[in-house]
From Swiss-Prot:
Protein name: RNA-directed RNA polymerase
Keywords: Magnesium, Nucleotide-binding, Nucleotidyltransferase, RNA-binding, RNA-directed RNA polymerase, Transferase, Viral RNA replication, Virion
Originating organism: Rotavirus A (strain RVA/Cow/United States/WC3/1981/G6P7[5])
Coiled coil: none
Localisation per UniProt entry: Virion
Catalytic activity annotation: RNA(n) + a ribonucleoside 5'-triphosphate = RNA(n+1) + diphosphate
Length: 1088
């Protein structure tokens, strides 16, 4: 097996380098004779080490085990005291420690002062402004770097340069940390006052960021960027990232387009060799110069110089360096402010009387009309979702905080919890559940706040509203989103599109007589001026809608929604400030409502339309596209004449002046060739993404385990890598080793092997080969997968007790009764399971499950339990298929231009050969006829797993399932008796398999799986008519071909001769595939 086990063994001898340390490898095998040898080998190793005898002889004696069995884990003993980090660090602490400049940041606590200066006593201390919020420690991070450095000190040539660059940067970190001593973390990986009081407050988070940056250094340019950011971020904890990334919004406007990809009528990307010149007025260069000056004022030298040098010829070839700077700037870590400052920030905007009422009127009307347009059809037709909005809300209620901790009784158990789902159950049990009354959020009941931290931006506050707000808004917002799904203007929601489609949309209309206007409206969304017109527009829309129906329940839904808007127009928030809780009248819009995303998109669309209608009084142009994407909006305007510098400048100034008339503090820019928005930027006709995901600092703490976080770390590393920011893979693997190790006692630790962590099981954390998802098909792989499946789900006593209480049971049966027209076990069980799963966010339950999981894992890692499972996984299917394929060499020419320059070479090569896709493959079954039928009559949304289970039942059972969900008998009969039903079987199976194979994640989401170039490498003679089997054979072949190409940069072709007799067997098996959830799949999902 691969590199991981090798590094693991080297890492262990690096960490435990004393005489007393022992490493015992544990092997397993699916072959019973060899397995017995494995067991013998293990017990002899234990015996020898207990008696202080060396293990070398055993390794020779049991060479058959070492050569033929699979490494399961490594057991490591060490009686060493744990000051090893400090000892090793001294060797590297040869430089001059950094001194923080304590005047850089406006807010006193953002300066990197000694902790006791910021917080004189332990009572005042909080780690919330510098908490790395990750389940790994600074000492582990230092160890991982020192391990890498020691391993590579004898590198040669180019590798030696990388070593020297990193060593130089680590010297800065080591010297600074060593000056104060390595802060020791507690068992929750937090840094307490006693540890921090004599050290700079931001030392830990700074060191983590710096380590992340220095381990991402390869070239000399990387080194210069990293050095500057590491040194300056030690002092500047507030504006550094913003300063460094600001110029990008202008840089994208400077590069000529010479050939680009555009979206064609079929929504595919096609190459266009058009040439568009960048028209840049002097004013733009002045603004850029100002930005570079601001950077220099802040002490930056190398980075502004790189940008200055690039400006000489503004070439797309050298643009990736600009992209790199832009990505690196985020890796200085999160800016975490006090809640009070975050809230006051939005309240400081001056209110002027001098605004254009006419524009505000137009803005409000546009919001009103859009709300009406979105909801008109469902309201007129008395849509059942709007009738049963309360039930729909309850079914999709989250288990997030409800804003206050309450004492709740479940049977004989009394617990304290803040979770929404538990509050709802408790309220129902005690007759306090009144969804028809939306509680006020005024001065008597101010809103508690959550927070959102982002690198390079101020902290934003989030409303934690009572659950009644969610129930009132859910159904209506869902209907708005359905409308947005087939409206191109809403880039974020547009049906199954991905970022590449939006890219082709912009470049489509760029030409010498058009310009693109792009605006960052994030300031506007949270500004006070927006709130009244915004809420009023929505209210007016709801009033108009209420007149379009006579259905009392629909009117009630609209009225409750309206009430949430009315209440929020008079909102107060509560902010803890020291001991007191301050109540502040908060007149701005904040995130936290269900409608946040949808409503902001509506408002931003209304805003750009208002501005454009003003501009059109002065210029004559055609609006080719208008798009809104989150906090950004953009539009392409086509004029009758060629665009000149003067025109760009005039339009730009007029647009800004128009925004100013609404007192909207937004950043509006006009360009002829590119745009920059939060999600992506287009320069020189190519698309770029910011690779700004922090690896060693997290935004907030959740209830995920170390394993989960190791998987998230790997997943973040992959996303960054696809976007052009590469961190040393060995370092990432070292972090995974540290984070997945399990302590047995103080001196005894167990480290799982690569096989355990990469096999597609409930414990999967990473892929042995980046970008390639392998599904093991060897005996040992399937054996271990089976073993892990035997201990997959852990029980929790607390959860069982809650689930057995009448409060819980009554709640679940109440949901079932409201939803179902007749008995339906599948749905009832499903609801109960979903509700029980929501309990996991209650800490004591997740802790209990974690402990059980770990003890089961410990047993398993020392000796896998043989477990004959009847469950079939996707691995079994692929294992059956594999033998019937024969491989031969093939050749595919490169035939597409690059349009995503930051991709790693091996991924880029595949796109250049087979092309890319601009759509998401449907993997949730929502396009199937049965799913549409259910959503036509019921608010219940079955998961892909449930659809997969239901569609394979007997026809009469499917009928009963449908009828119980309120589908009229005639419709259910028609469905089962029609061709559509057999098409559905195939379609749902297809969706389910796509889902299992994570086809929309990682780099697979970039490839065109239906590429004719790919198809011609695969030959499968057509036998018998089982489309499902043909599908899986083709998909397997495509994945094999693509994986081979990623790994080797060359193509193979596959021929399959699948016997007819086997087909029916395989088809039967395909209806019993179990899906596996793992930290790895969670991390993928988390990216979404």
């Amino acid at each position: 097996m691969g590199k991981y086990n090798l590094i693991l063994s080297e890492y262990l001898s690096f960490i435990y380098n004393s005489q007393s340390a022992v490493q015992i490898p544990i092997y397993y095998s699916s072959n019973s004779e060899l397995e017995n040898r494995c067991i013998e080998f293990h017990s002899k190793c234990l015996e020898n080490s207990k008696n202080g005898l060396p293990l070398k002889k055993l390794f020779v004696e049991y060479s058959d085990v070492i050569e033929n069995a699979t490494l399961l884990s490594i057991l490591s003993y060490s009686y060493d005291k744990y000051n090893a980090v400090e000892r090793k660090l001294v060797k590297y602490a040869k430089g001059k420690p950094l001194e923080a400049d304590l005047t850089v940041n406006e807010l006193d606590y953002e300066n990197n002062k000694i902790t006791s200066e910021l917080f004189p006593t332990a009572e005042e201390y909080t780690d919330s402004l510098m908490d790395p919020a990750i389940l790994t420690s600074l000492s582990s991070n230092l160890n991982a770097v020192m391990f890498w450095l020691e391993k590579h000190e004898n590198d040669a040539a180019e590798k030696l340069k990388i070593y020297k660059r990193r060593l130089d940067l680590f010297t800065i970190v080591a010297s600074t940390v060593n000056k104060y001593g390595v802060p020791r973390h507690n068992e929750k990986y937090r840094y307490e006052y006693e540890v921090m009081k004599d050290k700079p407050y931001y030392l830990v988070t700074w060191a983590n960021s710096s380590i992340e940056m220095l381990m991402s250094v390869f070239s000399h340019e990387d080194y210069l960027i990293a050095r500057e950011l590491i040194v300056l971020s030690y002092s500047n904890r507030s504006t550094l990232a913003k300063l460094v990334s600001s110029p990008m919004s202008i840089l994208v406007a400077l590069v000529d387009i010479n050939g680009t990809f555009i979206t064609n009528e079929e929504l595919e990307l096609e190459f266009s060799n058009k040439y568009v010149r960048a028209i840049v007025p002097d004013q733009t260069f002045d603004e850029l110069k100002q930005m570079l000056d601001n950077m220099r004022k802040a002490g930056l030298t190398d980075i502004p110089k790189m940008i200055q040098d690039w400006l000489a010829d503004c070439s797309i070839e050298k643009f990736p360096l600009m992209a790199k700077i832009y990505s690196w700037s985020f890796h200085v870590g999160f800016r975490k402010q006090k809640m009070l400052d975050a809230a006051l920030d939005q309240l400081k905007t001056e209110y002027t009387e001098d605004i254009d009422d006419e524009m505000y009127r137009e803005y409000t009307m546009l919001i009103r009309d859009e709300v009406v347009k979105m909801l008109k059809e469902p309201v007129k037709h008395d849509d059942h979702l709007l009738q049963d909005s309360e039930l729909a809300g309850l079914l999709s209620m989250s288990s997030a905080s409800n804003g206050e901790s309450r004492q709740l009784k479940f049977g004989r158990k009394t617990i304290f919890s803040t979770k929404k789902n538990m509050h709802v159950m408790d309220d129902m049990a005690n007759g306090r559940y009144t969804p028809g009354i939306i509680p006020p959020v005024n001065v008597d009941k101010p809103i508690p706040l959550g927070r959102r931290d982002v690198p390079g931006r101020r902290t934003r506050i989030i409303f934690i509203l009572p659950y009644e707000y969610f129930i009132a808004q859910h159904a209506v917002v869902e209907k708005m989103l359905i409308y947005a799904k087939h409206t191109r203007e809403y880039a974020e929601f547009y049906s199954q599109s991905n970022q590449l489609l939006s890219y082709g949309d912009v470049t489509r209309f760029l030409s010498n007589n058009s310009m693109v206007l792009y605006t960052d409206v994030s300031q506007w969304d949270s500004s006070q001026h927006n709130t009244q017109p915004f809420r009023k527009g929505i209210i007016m829309g709801l009033d108009m809608l209420a007149n379009m129906t006579n259905d009392a329940r629909v009117i009630q839904t609209l009225n409750l929604y309206k009430q949430t808007q009315i209440n929020l127009m008079d909102s107060y928030v509560q902010i803890p400030d020291g001991d007191v809780i301050k109540k502040i009248q908060y007149g701005a819009v904040a995130s936290g409502e269900k409608q946040t995303k949808a409503a902001n998109s509506i408002a931003n669309l209304a805003l750009i339309k208002t501005v454009l209608s003003r501009i059109s009084n002065k210029y004559s142009f055609a609006t080719k596209i208008i798009r809104v994407d989150g906090d950004d909006n953009y539009a392409v305007l086509q004029f009758n004449t060629e665009v000149t510098k003067q025109m760009v400048q005039d339009v730009s100034n007029d647009v800004r002046e128009t925004y100013a008339r609404m007192n909207a503090k937004v950043k509006a820019l006009v360009s002829t060739v590119g745009i920059e928005i939060a999600k992506r930027y287009i320069a020189g006709g190519k698309i770029f993404f910011r690779a700004g995901i922090n690896l060693l600092n997290n935004e907030k703490r959740g209830q995920s385990t170390q394993w989960d976080q190791a998987a998230v770390l790997y997943s973040n590393y992959i996303v960054n890598r696809l976007r052009g920011f590469e961190t040393d893979r060995e370092f990432i693997l070292t972090k995974i080793m540290q984070m997945t190790s399990v302590a047995i006692t103080g001196s005894l630790r167990l480290f799982p092997s690569e096989r355990v962590l990469t096999t597609n099981s409930t414990f999967k954390v990473f892929d042995s080969e980046d970008f390639i998802i392998e599904y093991g098909t060897t005996d040992d792989e399937v054996y271990i997968q089976r073993a892990f499946m035997s201990l997959s789900s852990q029980k929790s006593g607390i959860a069982d007790e809650i689930a057995a209480s009448s409060t819980f049971k009554n709640y679940v049966s109440r949901l079932s009764e409201q939803l179902l027209f007749s008995k339906n076990n599948i749905v009832s069980k499903g609801i109960a399971l979903t509700e029980k799963a929501k309990l996991n966010s209650y800490a004591p339950i997740s802790l209990e499950k974690r402990r059980a999981q770990i003890s089961a894992l410990l047993t398993m890692l020392q000796k896998p339990v043989t477990f004959k499972s009847s469950k079939i996984t996707i691995n079994d299917i692929l294992r059956d298929i594999k033998p019937f394929f024969t491989v031969s060499e093939a050749h595919l020419p490169i035939q597409y231009q690059k349009f995503m320059p930051t991709l790693p070479d091996n991924v880029q090569y595949i796109i250049q050969c087979i092309g890319s896709r601009t759509y998401q493959i449907e993997d949730d079954g929502s396009k199937s006829a049965i799913s549409r039928l259910i959503s036509k009559y019921s608010v219940y949304k079955p998961s892909i797993e449930e659809l997969y289970k239901v569609i394979s039942l007997h026809e009469n059972e499917i009928q009963l399932y449908l009828i119980s969900l309120g589908i009229p008998k005639i419709d259910a009969d028609t469905y089962v008796g029609s061709k559509i039903y057999s098409q559905d079987k195939y379609r749902i199976l297809e969706s389910y398999v796509y889902n299992l194979l994570s086809i929309n994640y990682g780099c697979y989401q970039l490839f065109d799986f239906n590429s004719p170039d790919l198809e011609k490498l695969i030959r499968i003679p057509f036998k018998g008519k089982i489309p499902a089997v043909t599908f899986i054979l083709h998909l397997y072949a495509k994945l094999e071909v693509i994986n081979h190409a990623i790994k080797n940069g060359s193509w193979i072709s596959l021929f399959c001769n699948y016997p007819k007799s086997e087909m029916i067997k395989l088809w039967k098996k395909m209806w019993n595939i179990t899906s596996l959830r793992s930290p790895y799949t969670n991390a993928n999902f988390f990216q979404d």
